[in-house]
C-alpha cells in the first residue's frame, strides 16, 4: 500500500463552525419511511457482497442513504424515489471503495481491477459475466432503464463513465500524495458523480431534459452550480472522515496545504463558498426563469428540484453518520465549537 501523509493536526481537532446562511428551504419526500425500509433490504440483498465485512454493511445501513435521496429529490414520483435511494447506496459504496485510503483509495492497480470489471456495464458491452462489482452496477442501471428514454439512458451512462474516470484520477493522485490546486480539485470532484446524480433527479421527476441541456448553456451552468454545492458541503462535513483516513483529497486540506491557511481560516473559507454557490444558483435560476426556456413547466419544476438538492444535501450532512461517525445522532447545533476525533464529530454548540 502506498504511504499516506502523516496527520497534520493530531488525533483530536477543534474548530469553530460558523452558521451557514441558507436561502432555499428544506423539503423531504413524503415516502421517506417506505424508501428507508426498502433500501435497507436492497443493501442487504444486492450490495452485501461489496462490503469487506458485516460491520461495514451495518455502517452503510445506518448512514441514512434513503434520507439523502428523499431530501435532494423531494418531488420525485413515488415509485421512483425508492430507486433513487438504491442509486445512492450503490454509488456511495463505489465511492467508498475508491476513496477510502484503507480500502483501494491508494492502490491504483487494485482499483483499476474494479473499474475494469464495472466498465462493460456502462459501455453496453456487458455479457452477463463479470465479478460482483459489475453485477451491482449493472443491476442498478437496469432498474432505471425501462423508465428512461434511450437518449437519456445514453447520457446517464456517459455521466457514470465520467464518474468512474474521475475515480481513476483521484486514486492515482492520492497514491502519489499529490494535492491539486483548488480549480483542478473542484473540477475533478464535480465530475465525480454530480451530473450522474442530477440525471437521476431528473429521472425521478419523470423528465428527459437531454435536448434542453444540449441547447441551454444557462441550464448546464445551473446544474454545475449544484455540483459545486455538493462538493463544498460534502468536504466540510467529510473532512473528519477523510483526514483520519490519511486522505487529503478534501477542500480543507487543499486550502491548508496548497494555500497555507490555518484550519479555522480554511473552514471559514469553505463555509463562505457554500453560501456563495447557493446565491449564485438562485441568481442563475432567476435568470433562466425569466427566459424563454424558463416558461417550460418541466424546466421550472426541475430548477425548483435543483434548489431542494442544494438545501437537502446540506441538511443531510449535519445528520449522517457517514461523515459524523458511527452512532451519530445530530443534536440540532448548526454553529459553535466542533471537535473531530477518529470516531466521531462532536457539535458542542
Tell what function each PLM region has.
Residues 1-349:
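Alpha-helical, largely C-terminal catalytic domains
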Amino acid at each position: 500500500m502506498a504511504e499516506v501523509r502523516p496527520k497534520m493536526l493530531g488525533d483530536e481537532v477543534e474548530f469553530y463552525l460558523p452558521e451557514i446562511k441558507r436561502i432555499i428551504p428544506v423539503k423531504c419526500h413524503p415516502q421517506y419511511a417506505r424508501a428507508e425500509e426498502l433500501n435497507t433490504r436492497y443493501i442487504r440483498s444486492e450490495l452485501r457482497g461489496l462490503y469487506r465485512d458485516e460491520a461495514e454493511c451495518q455502517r452503510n445501513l445506518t448512514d441514512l442513504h434513503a434520507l439523502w435521496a428523499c431530501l435532494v429529490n423531494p418531488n420525485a414520483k413515488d415509485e421512483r424515489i425508492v430507486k433513487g435511494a438504491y442509486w445512492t447506496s450503490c454509488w456511495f459504496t463505489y465511492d467508498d471503495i475508491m476513496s477510502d485510503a484503507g480500502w483501494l483509495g491508494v492502490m491504483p492497480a487494485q482499483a483499476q481491477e474494479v473499474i475494469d470489471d464495472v466498465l462493460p456495464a456502462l459501455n453496453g458491452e456487458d455479457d452477463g459475466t463479470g465479478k460482483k462489482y459489475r453485477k451491482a452496477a449493472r443491476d442498478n442501471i437496469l432498474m432505471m432503464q425501462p423508465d428512461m428514454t434511450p437518449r437519456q439512458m445514453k447520457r446517464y451512462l456517459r455521466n457514470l463513465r465520467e464518474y468512474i474516470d474521475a475515480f481513476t484520477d483521484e486514486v492515482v493522485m492520492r497514491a502519489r500524495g499529490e494535492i491539486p490546486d483548488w480549480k483542478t480539485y473542484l473540477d475533478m470532484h464535480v465530475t465525480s458523480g454530480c451530473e450522474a446524480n442530477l440525471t437521476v433527479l431528473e429521472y425521478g421527476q419523470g423528465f428527459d431534459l437531454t435536448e434542453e441541456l444540449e441547447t441551454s448553456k444557462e441550464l448546464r451552468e445551473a446544474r454545475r452550480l449544484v455540483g459545486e454545492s455538493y462538493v463544498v458541503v460534502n468536504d466540510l462535513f467529510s473532512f473528519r472522515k477523510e483526514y483520519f483516513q490519511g486522505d487529503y483529497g478534501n477542500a480543507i486540506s487543499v486550502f491548508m496545504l496548497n494555500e497555507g491557511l490555518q484550519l479555522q481560516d480554511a473552514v471559514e473559507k469553505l463555509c463562505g463558498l457554500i453560501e456563495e454557490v447557493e446565491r449564485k444558483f438562485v441568481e442563475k435560476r432567476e435568470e433562466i426563469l425569466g427566459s424563454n426556456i424558463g416558461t417550460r413547466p418541466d424546466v421550472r419544476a426541475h430548477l425548483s428540484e435543483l434548489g431542494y438538492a442544494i438545501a437537502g444535501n446540506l441538511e443531510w450532512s449535519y445528520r449522517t453518520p457517514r461523515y459524523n461517525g458511527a452512532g451519530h445522532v445530530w443534536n440540532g447545533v448548526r454553529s459553535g465549537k466542533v471537535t473531530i476525533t477518529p470516531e466521531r464529530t462532536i457539535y458542542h454548540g
